[in-house]
């Protein structure tokens, strides 16, 4: 029952975090940010699309937590020390009165099992990993080098030495909390692996700090909500980095492929050649992607002349334009993101309602038990 209560706290906190993500995502459907691969701007994205990725990860975490909850919510009553008892105990009735879904039949495994506990902390560890990954992105986004995310002072601190510093303390704390929980998880699994299927004190040693780590996890989930709420995208900077980082170069190569019928590998070489030429001339800017440069690189790499106006080239390299061209679904295209948001809200609402009903049933059973 204690582990069941712990899972309830974690599930409630996670549901609250998904609500916050939905709220902020709905306000940033067209807020352009650069997506990154290998630490470099890659293609155009949006803040809403990023947040809904986190939202989907949390929904997956909720599924794991729910599965652990189903495993945990079984009654071991009547097993005694693992062999059962001669007392005439109505195990099914007691299980119902305590809000359990079912009874564990095998008297030995109901006492000696540790899988329910390991399943619980595994789900929590994966959830913590989700939180840490988001925190790493947010710290990077807020760095002076990236500078597309601005945290409010309520979740930052300065330096005791360097007064100009504005450190993303609350986001960094999320990563630290994850490290502590992963250490606890490793200890619990190691301890469980050394036990037998018979009851021993070793089986219960990793329970000692269980609630401490659950409380810290719940706080960590709260930090996610807080960091999302107390931050905003520097829209002009983000759009500038997205545009000037040539993140729509892939879209340009795709567009040339569709217009000319040439393979993408070839148009990729043409666009790449244009950008490399500008890099070698120390003139890397989207505005320097000219018709003459396109003509020269297409003749060099393909032996054909591809001619486009300056306006056409600039449109192909416009991040917002490239987003509207996406057709595969699930993309940062605002219409796709809006659709995912609506589906995500519906999924979260369904999970929330199921959880509410389960808690209400258990609460009702416990209240009747007291009566």
Annotate each language-model stretch with its function:
Residues 162-371:
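Glycine-rich cofactor/substrate-binding loops
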Residues 20-37, 105-106:
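Short, flexible active-site-proximal loops enriched in glycine and acidic residues
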Residues 1, 58, 88-89, 247-251, ...:
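A generic alpha-helix surface/boundary motif
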Residues 31-35, 68-74, 141-145, 149, ...:
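Flexible, glycine/charged-enriched surface loops at secondary-structure junctions
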Residues 9, 13-16, 20-23, 266-273:
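A non-catalytic, amphipathic alpha-helix used as a structural packing/dimerization or gating element
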